[in-house]
């Protein structure tokens, strides 16, 4: 799968009040990758978000953090994919994942939205295809589905945040492996990682 990913998206809600909430974990991956590669993200209205570009092995990796609310994330993703002629299977969407504990992150191809409104809208705007890749950043689960909305829009306690940040850092390193050596090598490394 070497160099197949052409667009990396970090799902988030816009605005300072949401910046450090669990729901924005996907955006933290893109921000960290941009920082490591010394890339400035800039607002681009035609893509409804912050964009950047990294070159790896002569190939472009486009970066996008939608600045629409989470449930409208697909709008910018679809616009960017259409403009740069990027297929769904060349897209990797980083997002917060309730079903993984803090300190864990996993790659996945395809699948449903699992109740995640950002994924739901992405699937919808990509003509109902689910064949894009995901980078699932574990945030843990509040224990009851009625508590999920408040949980994802809340900030993690310090210890949990440190675990999430460690998983984001490792995910960023694994994205470099993915771009150079393909998914299986990146997966092998990331899927054995667990922050303590």
Curated annotation (Swiss-Prot):
MF terms in GO: peptidyl-tRNA hydrolase activity; tRNA binding
Subunit structure: Monomer.
Function: Hydrolyzes ribosome-free peptidyl-tRNAs (with 1 or more amino acids incorporated), which drop off the ribosome during protein synthesis, or as a result of ribosome stalling.
EC number(s) given by UniProt: 3.1.1.29
Catalyzed reaction equations: an N-acyl-L-alpha-aminoacyl-tRNA + H2O = an N-acyl-L-amino acid + a tRNA + H(+)
Domain of life where this protein originates: Bacteria
Binding-site residues for tRNA, renumbered to this chain: 18, 69, 71, 117
Name of the protein: Peptidyl-tRNA hydrolase
Record lineage: Bacteria, Pseudomonadati, Pseudomonadota, Gammaproteobacteria, Vibrionales
EC class: hydrolase
Discriminates between blocked and unblocked aminoacyl-tRNA, annotated site positions: 13
Active-site feature positions: 23
Organism field: Aliivibrio fischeri (strain MJ11) (Vibrio fischeri)
Keywords: Cytoplasm, Hydrolase, RNA-binding, tRNA-binding
PROSITE patterns, per the entry: PEPT_TRNA_HYDROL_1, PEPT_TRNA_HYDROL_2
Record-level GO cellular component terms: cytoplasm
GO biological process assignments: protein quality control for misfolded or incompletely synthesized proteins; rescue of stalled ribosome
UniProt family annotation: Belongs to the PTH family.
InterPro entries: Pept_tRNA_hydro, Pept_tRNA_hydro_CS, Pept_tRNA_hydro_sf
Site (Stabilizes the basic form of H active site to accept a proton): 96
Subcellular location: Cytoplasm
